[in-house]
C-alpha cells in the first residue's frame, strides 16, 4: 500500500503539489495523468523518497517515510521497483547483467540463483533468450521491457512507472501496456503509472487520478473519468480522442520490435 496524506510540495516558494491525499491499495494499478508541469513526476519522487515533502505524510506499507534518512530509505526502496522514462540501462552491461544488477547489490544469492531469476523475469516481459544482448542492440520498446525486468527482479511489492510509453509508436505502446498488465497479474502488489498517454491509462488502470496545477481535480475508474463533467478533464481526454482518430487515419506501417 501507498498512502499520501495532506502532501504539500514547494520549490522556491512556488507550490508544486497542494494538499494531495491518495491511497493505492495492494493489487491495484493507478494511472496518474495531467499536463506537463502538473506535479506528476514529483509525486513519484516523493513515493520513492528522492524528495521530501514540505508538509504531510508518506506511508509505504506500515512505515511513514517522509523524514527518513538515506539508510532507512534504502531499506524501504527494496520493496520498490522503478521503471524510468528513458529505460536508464547501463550501456556497458548486457541485458542479463542489467537485470541482475539489483540482485547482486542487495542479495547474497549465488550466481546460479541469480541467472535463474534473470531468465524468469525476461520471460515475464517477453524477452526470452536476450540475456547476452547489449542495450545498443535493442529497440526502444525492448529497452523498456528490460527496464521492467530489472525492476521486478527483486520481487518488489510496489512498481513505479515514469512515462513507460514515452517515445514509442502506438503499437509498441500497446505492447508495453500489455506487459505492464501481465506483470501486475503475476506480481500483484501496487502499480503506479505516471503517463501522458491516455490510451495507456485507459488500458491498464483500475483507477485514474488527474493532477492539474498541483491539485487532484478528478479521481475514479476509467469509465468515471471518461464521463467526468470537469471541463479540464474533458479537454485532456478530447486531445487524446483527436490523436487516436489521427492514428486510425494514418496507420503505422513499420514497427520495430
Regions found by a protein language model. Give the residues of each.
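Conserved ABC ATPase "signature" region
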Residues: 64, 111-129
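Helix-to-loop junction immediately C-terminal to a conserved catalytic motif
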Residues: 48
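Catalytic Walker B motif of ABC-type/P-loop ATPase nucleotide-binding domains
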Residues: 159-162
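The feature captures the beta-strand-to-loop junction immediately N-terminal to the Walker
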Residues: 33-35
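A short, proline-enriched helix->beta-strand linker immediately N-terminal to the Walker B motif
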Residues: 153-157
Amino acid at each position: 500500500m501507498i498512502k499520501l496524506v495532506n502532501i504539500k510540495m514547494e520549490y522556491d516558494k512556488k507550490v508544486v503539489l497542494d494538499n494531495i491525499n491518495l491511497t493505492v491499495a495492494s493489487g491495484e494499478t493507478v494511472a496518474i495523468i495531467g499536463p506537463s508541469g502538473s506535479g506528476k513526476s514529483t509525486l513519484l519522487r516523493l513515493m520513492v523518497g528522492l524528495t521530501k515533502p514540505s508538509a504531510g505524510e508518506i506511508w509505504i506499507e506500515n512505515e511513514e517515510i517522509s523524514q527518513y534518512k538515506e539508510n532507512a530509505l534504502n531499506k524501504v526502496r527494496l520493496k520498490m521497483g522503478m521503471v524510468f522514462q528513458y529505460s536508464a540501462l547501463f550501456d556497458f552491461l548486457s541485458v542479463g547483467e542489467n537485470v541482475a544488477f539489483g540482485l547482486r547489490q542487495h542479495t547474497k544469492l549465488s550466481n546460479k540463483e541469480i541467472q535463474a531469476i534473470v531468465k524468469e523475469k525476461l520471460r515475464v516481459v517477453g524477452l526470452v533468450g536476450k540475456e547476452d544482448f547489449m542495450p545498443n542492440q535493442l529497440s526502444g520498446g525492448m529497452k523498456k521491457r528490460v527496464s521492467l525486468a530489472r525492476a521486478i527482479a527483486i520481487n518488489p511489492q510496489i512498481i513505479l512507472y515514469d512515462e513507460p510509453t514515452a517515445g514509442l509508436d502506438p503499437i509498441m505502446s500497446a505492447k508495453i501496456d500489455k506487459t505492464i498488465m501481465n506483470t501486475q497479474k503475476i506480481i500483484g502488489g501496487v502499480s503506479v503509472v505516471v503517463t501522458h498517454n491516455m490510451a495507456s491509462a485507459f488500458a491498464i488502470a483500475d483507477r485514474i487520478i488527474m493532477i492539474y496545477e498541483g491539485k487532484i481535480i478528478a479521481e475514479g475508474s476509467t469509465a468515471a473519468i471518461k464521463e467526468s463533467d470537469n471541463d479540464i478533464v474533458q479537454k485532456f481526454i478530447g486531445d487524446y480522442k483527436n490523436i487516436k482518430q489521427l492514428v486510425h487515419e494514418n496507420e503505422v506501417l513499420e514497427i520495430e520490435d
